[in-house]
């Protein structure tokens, strides 16, 4: 509940009373076993009031709230002072706010301004709705105190106002305030009095954005939320919020380890057909139809769920998938994430935008992971270096793996249509984010019920990630719901990156010496059979693929075969079929239990049932 008499116990204006109360609480916590004697004494020795006064003084000197970047910078510097110099919380805070430190940051003011402008530009959004953070405390006539929140407000609107479909979002601030006023009036009709009330309006859908220079690890800009920032150290959606990453995680947890450690190539194929694990059935994002054999390249380009799942199940294992995500800097995973769902970004806690974007920055940096850098050095008031923040790097992926993933993610952002029968192709998922006159690669992500949307991508210069969604997990679209749709974030990513790269030339992505090319069949991932793979009824299945040196396949395609068909029946020709009705045709060899797929439509037919060699009985009347 809310602290009794909070103004009297204000740690700034009522520090003495607060200290007495603090002492009582710490003693009670010790007596009830919540803390040890040593922890009690350590807490009592902490000069917390000096720290609070310093922060309060700093805030009063600068009435404009800190930016999201500064908020995170404060956290990073505080942790560095504690970890590297052994300072306590109090000492680090005192030094930071009143010690005259000189802190050098790689933030780019021009890029930061572009990010802030685009994230807050109403023209970039298809909706403007509002959620509320609401707190109300009442004293009832019988003297009892009761507390209310946005959740009780939502229930009241649904049940008392009869709006059963109300999802917690309002169409305007005025509409939200009217509902709050009506709610308060209803609650105080019995003579209850208001002890305290706070209302914060939050613009929805929300957004966070991170931009990193992958070659250095320098964080050039972040934005932790759409709308005016009204206070310091508020929720930073770029660094603090853990959200489900959706299909962006296919690259990190399934395809990256498959290529890097498991002998797979971009041409390795998995069968896109009905798939279940335990009691859970999986589907592709486009619906219930399946496409048959498809490569890892296709799995990335068209964000194919079944291909990613089979890759993790058959090649990688969930354990290795989690290990690779952690190698790429994801720190929020737990043991329960060692499941197939991780391949699709179904995580226990989720990930932060900062860590997800930096994982892709490692791919953009040739496989070298660099811990994100918010400051380069800290000097004391006399100019002496306290901390020289050297980059922490490690080789997370082979340079060949990084390039292969980059090449496939370039296809995501180019206009491509899946290799299928006419009229059933799926489009590449990132074309909306493509920026003009600059090489770019990236991956989209959308979570169940369209709750979260992501796009993380990079150029030869910068890696950027954007998250979109509602703070309280309302769907962005679905049925009659329209809370911003599922594409606005890609437009914002494109707008920001286009402006950031305006004066930069396009050097392209460097192909490392560890890469070679070869022609393969896209339906087997193996060397094509001359005249067979190229004559698939859907068009040639032969294409040129990149490989890590030494991994070009040596076997020939075993998913295509050439057969003779009877044109009269469409079946395999028999010895009895007329020669002039026999044609040669390429067909697919598919799994017997693979279900109905695009490939099964072109699979081996049964024998001709018209010309089967059966004896024909001719009656006398018929021969007359």
Named regions from a protein language model:
Residues 105-128, 132-143, 147-201, 205-213, ...:
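A penicillin-recognizing enzyme superfamily signal
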Residues 281-285, 315-358:
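Mid-domain, small-residue-enriched loop/turn segments at the edges of structured enzyme/sensor domains
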Residues 6-16, 25-26, 30, 54-62, ...:
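Second-shell loop/turn segments in exported
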Residues 1-121, 125-150, 326, 331-332, ...:
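Non-catalytic, structured segments within soluble enzyme domains
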